[in-house]
């Protein structure tokens, strides 16, 4: 425990909390342009071909962003909106693309959790 005299000379340091999503710069989402759209494999013990886009953001950052859902229409030069949220089994992927906004289409034939995938409500028969 520090004495009062020591604290007067040198106050306590505040702990700086490190952001999990630094490229967003305290914004909820950011717009960017796809520079590369590709698939990659997850860490052990999982196995799949995960869809990922390399995105150059409006603030100059370049990040990897996961494309959720079944099927997508993204290619190079597509304009996308990204949000925070990492993918646990893909190292270095700390952002998600927002489905159903800008050039990203929503998932087709999606019945449940539609708002997460930008899918419209299906028509009644």
Swiss-Prot record:
Subunit structure as annotated in this protein's UniProt entry: Part of the 30S ribosomal subunit. Contacts proteins S8 and S17. May interact with IF1 in the 30S initiation complex.
Record function comment: With S4 and S5 plays an important role in translational accuracy. Interacts with and stabilizes bases of the 16S rRNA that are involved in tRNA selection in the A site and with the mRNA backbone. Located at the interface of the 30S and 50S subunits, it traverses the body of the 30S subunit contacting proteins on the other side and probably holding the rRNA structure together. The combined cluster of proteins S8, S12 and S17 appears to hold together the shoulder and platform of the 30S subunit.
Organism of origin: Thioalkalivibrio sulfidiphilus (strain HL-EbGR7)
Protein name: Small ribosomal subunit protein uS12
Domain of life: Bacteria
One GO term describing the cellular component: small ribosomal subunit
CDD domains (alphabetical): Ribosomal_S12
GO biological process: translation
Lineage, broadest ranks: Bacteria, Pseudomonadati, Pseudomonadota, Gammaproteobacteria, Chromatiales
InterPro entries: NA-bd_OB-fold, Ribosomal_uS12, Ribosomal_uS12_bac
Gene encoding the protein: rpsL
Residues carrying 3-methylthioaspartic acid: 89
Pfam families membership: Ribosom_S12_S23
Protein keywords: Methylation, Ribonucleoprotein, Ribosomal protein, RNA-binding, rRNA-binding, tRNA-binding
């Amino acid at each position: 425990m520090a004495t009062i005299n020591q604290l007067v000379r040198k106050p306590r340091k505040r702990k700086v909390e490190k952001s999990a999503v630094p490229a967003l710069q305290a914004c909820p989402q950011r717009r960017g342009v796809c520079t590369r759209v590709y698939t990659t494999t997850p860490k052990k013990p999982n196995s799949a071909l995960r869809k990922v886009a390399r995105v150059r953001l409006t603030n100059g950052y370049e990040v990897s962003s996961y494309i959720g859902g079944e099927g997508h229409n993204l290619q190079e030069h597509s304009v996308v909106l990204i949000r925070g949220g990492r993918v646990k089994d893909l190292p270095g992927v700390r952002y998600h693309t927002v489905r159903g906004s800008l050039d990203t289409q929503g998932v087709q034939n999606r019945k449940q959790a539609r708002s997460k995938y930008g899918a419209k409500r299906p028509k009644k028969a």
